[in-house]
Amino acid sequence: MRRIALPVFAVLSMSLLLPQQLAGAAPAGVSLAGVAAVDDPPLAEGDFLQVGPGLYSTDEQSFEIYETDVADGLMSRSHSVTAQAGSVAKPESAPASRPDMGVFGPGWEAEFVGGQLNRKLEEKANSVVVTDLDSNVAITYTLQSSVDYPSGGGVKKYVTADGDKLTETTRFDEATGTLVATASEVVGVTAPTADEDQSADTDATAAIGTSELTPAYTWKQAAPGADSWRVTGVGNVAVGSLSTATYDTQGRISTIQEAAVGENPAQSLAVKYSTATTSTSAALGEFAGRVKEITLTTGATTQTLARYSYDTSGLLRSVANPVEGTEPVSSYAYDSTGRVSDVTSPSNGDWDLSFPAESAVPNVEPIGPARPSSESVFTGAADITNEAAVAPPATDFTTGEISDPQSYPRHCNRATDWMWYLESGCAAWAAHYGWHKPYWKQTPTGHWVVGINNDGCSTPGPNVSKPRGFNFRSACDMHDYGYGLIGNTYKGYKYYLDRNKKSNVDNAFYTTMKTYSCNAYFITRRPACKAIAYVYYKAVGWKGNPRNGANAT
């Protein structure tokens, strides 16, 4: 959701600086007391409401649909509709100077790597300004020191009022005979406060792994034109978990590389673009300059995981996953203003939308069965609502492990069917360092997800569920539930999420932090929140394994 640019030193009202609590009472099984008391960041004004397939901000008067086409690498995009003074609400499009964000056509903004690449760097006289293009927040880094090299170039160091650091290095390149500038940006999480309850944490007596919780960005002048700086790496330097990006000559994303870390092999995502328009009035097809497909290479295996189709006006109309079949997994229709009026989405469901008068909040009608309501009684596996039960009944186990590539029940084939309880019957015990029942959990925006009661956010040393005060506890409890559902396959428990859904569980974890947690905080605090959310996401990607929790059950 891009807004009018705000500087990080914007003056806050005293009401925003007072302690604030999550709206609504916590249901049975929900505990927020396990998180240590820290100075919470100021909350956003207004409310965030789940409206059909998207999220509506009452303060910003903006509605956003967030879609992820490829879970690996968080290859995502967003469609935002914002109210206009004295006119109809209009969809937002990518800035003209950012071809990398406009590759899905009008009304959509690319959010590759979960939107972490959508940042802008501008050099001023004695400062550097980095703008988060999602929230349109400008972060000012003030010059602290500089050193010149005898051969040309040098090093300049900058810092923000919050202690975030940026270093720009310029060196003479003998091969090209030019000065080449790069930059590194570090978002500080100095002295994070550990959770009060560490009873389920096996390394609670060790030092807090601050360096492993610290987000970092690398930058390079990789695009043509005045707006030339691009993020070329994002993640955590201490554990070598940077996602690296390359760009083509037009400044569009070319590849996203993931280095081999832990048990995970190296991966490479390639974004391919159409060179000609093939769509006609009779059939959808390619559109010149738009994304054609996204492929994933792991080892010697390359798969096309997303293929896009457009109409003759260049509007995105459908997305297919060739690995699953030729039929679209997502499809869209638009009204005369370019706003999505019909959506079919694996994660957001099937909906009809209409925008009344000048409002940005749509009227929505579900297509097909309605979703279960939040805080409703779970249906699914036996004894999940039995307070006296401590494990699944013996009759629900088979002999040996389950390697079936499809989840059971069969209609619960998406990670979010369980973790957000989108389908009735998609609830079960979870094998994650013991048997756990599912409970409703509330995120800082008031959104309801499903998780277990265990150890919160697993981090090096004592667990930290509120880094820099941002509350990720519900997202972490939900992620533990997702891993436990996959872990059920190792225990022979007949209710499970299939093993190839790990990246989907991790993707839902990131979305729950980025969209349903970070948006709760005042707009100037969101860039830091999202950066830390990405580090938490990267950590479970390279370190997390559902088998571990199952083996300990």
Residue ranges and their predicted role:
Residues 130, 182-184, 189, 234, ...:
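Beta-strand-dense domains in secreted/periplasmic systems and polymorphic toxin scaffolds
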Residues 286-290, 297, 322:
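Extracellular beta-strand-rich, repetitive "passenger/adhesive" scaffolds
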Residues 1-29:
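Secretory targeting and sorting signals
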Residues 145-165:
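A short, surface-exposed interaction/processing loop segment used at functional sites
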